[in-house]
Amino acid sequence: MNCTYNENLYEHSFRTIDSHTMGEATRIIYDGFPELPGQTMMEKKEYLISHYDHYRKALMLEPRGHRDMFGALLTPPVHEEADYGVIFMDSGGCLNMCGHGSIGTASMLVETGMVDVSEPYTDVVLDAPSGLIRTRVKVQNGKAKQVSILNVPAFLYKENQTIDIQGYGMIQYDISFGGSFFALVDAEQIGIDITMENVDILSELGMLLLKKINETVPIKHPYLDITTVDLVEFYSHTDKPKADMKNCVIFGMAQADRSPCGTGTSAKMAALYAKGELALHTPFVYESVTGSLFTGEATKEVEVGDYRGIIPQITGSAYMTGMNTWLLDPEDPLELGFLLGTQKKAPKESDRSRIVRAAWQLFHEKG
């Protein structure tokens, strides 16, 4: 059966490769976006936000996407050694770096022949707002089997911070950089198990933490124009023998990462290394809320301004789910997308207290 459409009926079209990296979606946009001017990838990202954010919304939000959709826009690179520039995006905005998105993008570039492919390994370099992302793709019979990425320098920024969240009390956290700034929170201190059933609770608390931290804590990367904490990473012990710890990362419009989060793994390893709890060249296996795994490694120590950091390596796999053409119909009243419940509000204090009490009870029953 042959199926075609009349291009003249539509205002704009985009072509994408859809994939997931250990459960977390990456929609790779390779055609349809206007050229983004800028001398740096950060400038290109800012131009996208100020001029073409409606296209981001059209591709990330319903009906083409959903609250937890994630995307990667391919652009010409700024640095000559890079194969492609990439700007990561989600339902809430754009990000400077993404580990799972880098793994997904490198995998799909190999499987679609958009880079020169050699076996058993193909090196792909991505130019992101946070810096160059070097990936090594393990290739077998044309298929990307596994990807290792060397991330940008990661470092522990602030240690043993505390913040008062109404209904939860004082919560201790670290701030660590792994491509974006993360607030690292031990979920066991608040008595919430990291499970798929508890994601709504973690999402609401994560957004409360993001708001309060960014209102009260000054943030400044030593070199990059990054001045906010963009993600909250809840972590805890795991019962999975192959994993060292597990996490759930909250970001964007209360999105929950289905993968272990590459930048989050980098941020956590940097914190562990700074505290003397992780040695160089020691595998660190991180489990996601869905049970999928990333393997990380601190490859070497570096200085990031006044901070002692690491160069993290993250390894995982991605899988193609589709090749798509997306159309914008000028007669469609929802042409540029929508998001139900855009502002996830915190529950009332009585509800929060009930949630925490129930979580504590569940935690102690299991423990």
Question: What do these predicted regions represent?
Answer:
Residues 346-366:
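Basic, helix-initiating cap at the start of DNA-binding domains
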Residues 179:
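Glycine-rich ThDP/TPP pyrophosphate-binding loop and its adjacent helix/strand module
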Residues 1-176, 186-345:
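A glycine-rich beta-to-alpha transition motif near the start of alpha/beta enzyme domains, typified by
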Residues 182-183:
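Glycine-rich phosphate-binding loop plus the immediately following alpha-helix
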